[in-house]
């Protein structure tokens, strides 16, 4: 519970900062950061968001603006008090908002930002994590926030950090509606009271904010007045100064008197110059919205500044697309690709505010899901429509045909932008590292643009070395006899490159695409073909490699020769495999496990088993179909065939078949249901190899716990006793 202190009738409540926020503030206060100026950008950005909210509410309920029609941001430096004040006429905060938003409830980004900071990230990232307000403590020793929401009284929040803050009802000067942030600056931060410095920071970070930012400065100026006016003014001053004598008529000291002797002749009154104090108001962001200007007149620096003010990013954007659409529908858009993926790119619960929607230059909202598909959620920018109604609601947006057309155009322009970027290999590499998952998600979700998206994919292949290659480049290198694009999915480039599945394909000189991200499994389910060539997994049944007559004949002979062994192995393994066949894909491995054409690969099975909310019924039928393929040219398989032909009931044959199957499961990327039994078989093989007699070991250690004997195969489909092999 907060402490309550009573000052007369005024009630002051003290709250402790939530632990992570207190830690963050301590980090901000006690670490040296060179670019402290970003505090002003963050506070202006928060003010702009508050103004956006009240303007949006007023579109459906104009009475919300009765408490103040003008939407603006004022900056007021006061050198004598050493304070810098920011005032906005935004939505304001209720008492509950004040307590929750400024201290007691940690945002999801608080911890992530601290981790990023400690890993060496720049303090200027703070706004991207939703905790920009606390940057005020970079320059302030104490912060006071006075706020008034239409639904509540005026309240004041105050904190000098130190782990706690106070909230009280504020009976000072009424602010109507909005928020006033008063920063009591540290002694060494008074530069932010200087006109030049404030202007410089606002121009650098906030010149594209959509509301007027006005700087209020107390200045002195010389004023020229006539003698009569001077006397009146002096007279007024005299009344105010009680301690001065009132005998003589006041004389104004000459600052720069107009010494004209013949003034009488010219019938002109004498004039004097005096100094007076006045408040100078200067609007700092008169720039009209950048997206309304002609792209040819805008420099890359201006785009960069706008991008930074829009996103709170400290780095420049990677690429930009500025376009307008005219005709039946009219809108302008300015889209940016960032250099990095945000920390919460695929967090579903977080409302994305990456594209701001305007209607005729009036901001409507910044979390419009209908404006851009999920897979392009990293694109930042603005869209300004001439056709949508100003008072459009979220419900109307969902049904809006205009918005559907805008969305279609945005997707088209984004894909154009990616294709343009692909021509610059260095920058495309950065883009692909950050956003390849988005492109693959697009292939899974967006059937209309699947072909265009597939052209943007880049993969390592068996022939690409350290570089990544496009599917178009792969097709251009295909052999004349090759009809399909071969690929393999797995956990890493090293794992798939050494896989048994690629042995013969590579030996025959065919290129294999290595797909090593979990999302590739989903992507390739939808991407059935590219440029007229089907995509074929080398880990699934039915792999057809171009063969000449001699190879076909040899394959038929092998099938006939090993037919009985295949039948026997199927009997021994029973339900563990759907069938046992001769392989055309193995070279140096004795066997491998392949899956049916429509079943999951081993990699997909691994991914699905890792899902916390998996559907076990789907797991059942998708992972059941396994085929064991044996290599007819391998000595192990040949020896096994000979043993089986000599005595198909030989226990050693059964043991070896099970051991081969389980080893093939592992090398093919599957997991074992009973790894302990498999391990015990391997240990027994090692003992045999070392010539250790098991009976002797047991006799030497009579007190040792004897492990349960591994049951024979007949009684259990998972295990069999290992017989000594010649």
Swiss-Prot record:
The modification Phosphotyrosine is found at residues 303, 307, 486. The modification Phosphoserine is found at residues 226, 257, 263, 309, 447, 671, 720. Residues 2-529 are annotated as: Interaction with TP53. The modification N6-acetyllysine is found at residues 437, 483, 626. One of its GO terms (molecular function) is unfolded protein binding. Pfam families: HATPase_c_3 (PF13589), HSP90 (PF00183). The modification Phosphothreonine is found at residues 299, 481. Residues 225-246 have a biased composition (Acidic residues). The TPR repeat-binding motif mediates interaction with TPR repeat-containing proteins. Monomer. Homodimer. Forms a complex with CDK6 and CDC37. Interacts with UNC45A; binding to UNC45A involves 2 UNC45A monomers per HSP90AB1 dimer. Interacts with CHORDC1. Interacts with DNAJC7. Interacts with FKBP4. May interact with NWD1. Interacts with SGTA. Interacts with HSF1 in an ATP-dependent manner. Interacts with MET; the interaction suppresses MET kinase activity. Interacts with ERBB2 in an ATP-dependent manner; the interaction suppresses ERBB2 kinase activity. Interacts with HIF1A, KEAP1 and RHOBTB2. Interacts with STUB1 and SMAD3. Interacts with XPO1 and AHSA1. Interacts with BIRC2. This is Heat shock protein HSP 90-beta.
